[in-house]
Amino acid sequence: MKWLIRIVLIVVVLVVVLAVGGILMIDSIATAAVKHGAEFATQTDVELEGIDVKLFSTEGEIKKLDIKNPNGPFRDKFDSFMILGTGTAQISAGSLMSDTIVIPKVELSNIELSLVGLEGKKNYEVILESLKRFQGDNPPKESEGGKKIVIKELIIRNITVNYYFDADPALGAIAMGPKQIVIADDEPMVLTNVGAGGVPMPQITADIITDIMVQVMANLAGDLGGHMKGLANSLVDTLGTDKLGETLKDLNLGDHVKAIGDLGVDLGEGVGDLLKGVGEGTGDVLKGVGGGLKNLLGGKEEEKKEEE
């Protein structure tokens, strides 16, 4: 009987050791996958403190994902392009063994983003040029392996933007910064069905970064003017007007509609209709808007002449 008890105890200990070892391995695998996905997507250096998968639940915590600025003057100004301070994810347990992992909800907060313009060159142009590889029907073959991911609901809040811009005559923009501004702190950014159908980790990373940058462009169009015109142009080049329109549709544009239009960027017919619809749905906020938004919506600015 004593030998039987000992055997049972040994088996129990082995099961516990294997279970703990498996959890530790899951943490390591998840950390490596997220880090590699961010590095491959942005083609820059990435640091990740780690991912903690809860022992008896399907929740995970992302700890400080740090995407560095491209090497050179941009990194000299701000070391990091984007820092994700905290993130939590709920995972559908039934999908863990399938080819596509379904994540019902991801919440990201305490994000820091740096925007730098030096001598006509922008740090975001370098990053977006890398992310552009994942748009369209022919993403990099290296990103196609492994499991695919879809996020049903993505919530992003508390984005701190650090910026420094030289004067840029081409954009009609004066020198600004270094300064800091916080957005999405009162009303979080909420997106649904990110990575629809399931996409590889690098693609999810690219989608989340561009989503954040669209939010920043929309929120700061009024504050940073011409400098956001440059970002808007880059987003159009990276995403195309259709995908940019889909992202803007999910955002709460509110009072930013006029400022987005005043950038004078050709965001495409679909986005023009979207902004027009937002204006009509919010008490005709487009009345009195300047020529930039009228041109965006396909209209012509009419000058009123005073009769003498």
Model-based region annotation:
Residues 64-219, 238, 265, 269, ...:
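Secondary-structure transition motifs
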Residues 32, 36-37, 45, 96, ...:
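N-terminal "first-domain core" detector
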Residues 7, 11, 28, 56-59, ...:
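Generic alpha-helical scaffold signal
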Residues 4-11, 15, 220-231, 235-293:
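A hydrophobic membrane-anchoring feature enriched in long, contiguous, low-charge segments
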Residues 306-308:
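Short, solvent-exposed mixed-charge patches
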Residues 43-70, 157:
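N-terminal leader/targeting pre-sequences
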